[in-house]
Amino acid sequence: MVTRCVREAALLAWVVLWMLSTRVGTLLLCGRLSFSGAAGESPSVRRFADMPLERREATLQRWNRTRWLFPLRIVFTLVKILSHYVFYAMVNEKSQNPHWNAIGYRVEEWREEQAEPLAPAHARSRPLDSGVVETRALNDTTLLRSLADRGLAAKPGSSDAHHTVQCDAVIVGSGCGGGVAAAMLASSGYKVVVIEKGDYFTADDYSSIEGPSMERLFERGGIFCTSNVTTMLFTGATVGGGSAVNWSACIRTPGEVLQEWSREHGLPLFASPGYEQAMDAVCTRLGVTDGCLQEGFQNKVLRRGCEALGLPVDAVPRNSSDGHYCGSCNFGCPTGDKRGTDTTWLADAVNRGAVVLTGCKADRFILESNSGKNGRSKKCVGLLATCLSNGITKKLHIQAKVSISACGALMTPPLLRSSGLKNRHIGRNLHLHPVSMAWGYFPENKQGAPITGKSYEGGIITSMHRVTERTIIETPALSPGGFAAMVPWESGRDMKERMRQFARTAHAFALVRDRGAGFVDCEGRLRFTPNRDDTRELRHGLRRVLRILVAAGAAEVGTHRSDGLRLWCKGVRDEDLEAFLDEVTIEKGPMHSTTDKWALFSSAHQMGSCRMGSSSKDGAVDGRGESWEAEGLYVCDGSLLPTAVGVNPMITIQSLAYCLSKDIAQSLAYGKKH
């Protein structure tokens, strides 16, 4: 709880749990429900653990609905999410969970399908073996030896100094931006060092098991909430970053978005032929395919519902083969078919001499006075980083001609601030593509033409419906723990019934290109609340999702609102459906006390927190990605985007990184000549 929650929420939960262990505290928090005693006897107060089950349940229901005592609602939310997640996601020493059979869930065993047995793990080569240095298993001596073996000039530090490493370019982060930048610079002949906080895994390491996979592949173990408790965030923290755990959607930057960024934000790059060529190059390197031979259950539901309503539905390109039927790519693709930066751009980089340091966290960029040269008062000369191994006692001082922050929209702003940068746009303008979900239950024995499959099978996103210019509908990846954490809790019995229907419950979500902006306050703390316009778009999109689910033949549909809003669809009339849809609302998080209903948004896309601008008044960096304050310091990740892009942003981020790193390579070449 402490590692996955904001400090205040964890402290609040601790206080409430302590109070519930006492009679006085239970009386204060539970009121009359804590009383016991037979008729005619004086009532006594029980501790929460001694209360009858039905009274404990009634207490939680009261906390869920309380309007003014929102701290109790926050504790309810926290306990509900974590307890259900742990119950359904965690496994024993045999990688099994005894509850999965009851809900119709099983983990796909992809390796059983291979014709030949795999070689032992130590005998198999990995795409990055020639360039990766996994520091968690090293000490000071073996670290320096590993760096030297990979062609880096590394000097040991004295008793109180840092180890010094020399290179041409240091890149913090190995995801969509950092991976592309590393490949482009290394292919131009420069010595590149990539710093990655997470660890390196390949297809052979991915288990598709929710609990362990979330723990080692995602920031904060995959349970990461905004500090104002409005949005659950999912962001990769491994080699390959988000590209290793995303849902494979490869959608080009929409033309109207490119025009907006060029005209309204004064960034001509986005209207240039070079950017279009970059998108072509990125899609080619990722092996993007446009079709899907067999869709999974949820996408079949989305497609059937759209077709029944006469709505357009588009096939979503993916960075995998058209026959890819993996439903667990969000835990790293166990088939190796999905092509993230860890198997493409980073492989290109290490083949050209780049070195990737895993288990290594950037502390700050090293800035020196620049005497106002080029309008920048500072110059970046490298990076200070800490290896997370207990055996490595000294920090790394990486000297570089060019330094690039590519650790994502949540981590780049704190890194730049800790380095001494002051631009007011650093950490502002955060966009999250907030998502609101709806669900539909499709019994297997339904008459007619049933939709076959289970909710966790098949490609995660293969179909998309565009509601408006700003809102799209897609399907999510929800394994048992995530499903249980996010669906409403009304009672213990109701929750069991929801989980019993897990395998045949299809989810779809409305995603909005948000205009409201959040703030990254520091590492691990951010605030976000959609504005009214975003909320209207989300409500319109969520209502459309429900119509699609009903049209697809769902027996029951509902939303994730805390009161469990739902509709039984058998024999439903048009007027009944419209009345139900009129009840659909987009609620804020449990901290907001204006209503007894609440909901959480979800976000897998974070953008804009160090946006590009035509001047220092408009953005944190210039149109080349270079800091307005420090020469030689660049940003090359999703935080650059001027606004939300409105679709899955992987292709946009990689294409932008392609253009910027190509320009950085040319700048380095120019510096050599002059």
PLM feature segments, named:
Residues 1-108:
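Flexible, low-complexity segments enriched for small/polar residues
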Residues 643-662:
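A conserved FAD-binding loop/helix module that cradles the flavin
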Residues 81, 88, 97-150, 154, ...:
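Conserved redox-cofactor binding core of oxidoreductases
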Residues 166-194:
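N-terminal Rossmann-like FAD-binding beta1-loop-alpha1 element of flavoenzymes
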Residues 423-550, 556, 566, 596, ...:
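FAD cofactor-binding and catalytic pocket of flavoenzymes
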Residues 184-211, 232, 238, 351, ...:
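Glycine-rich loop(s) and the adjacent beta-strand/alpha-helix scaffold that form part
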Residues 48, 54-76, 87, 239, ...:
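Rossmann-like flavin
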Residues 190, 197-256, 299-307:
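N-terminal FAD cofactor-binding segment of flavoenzymes
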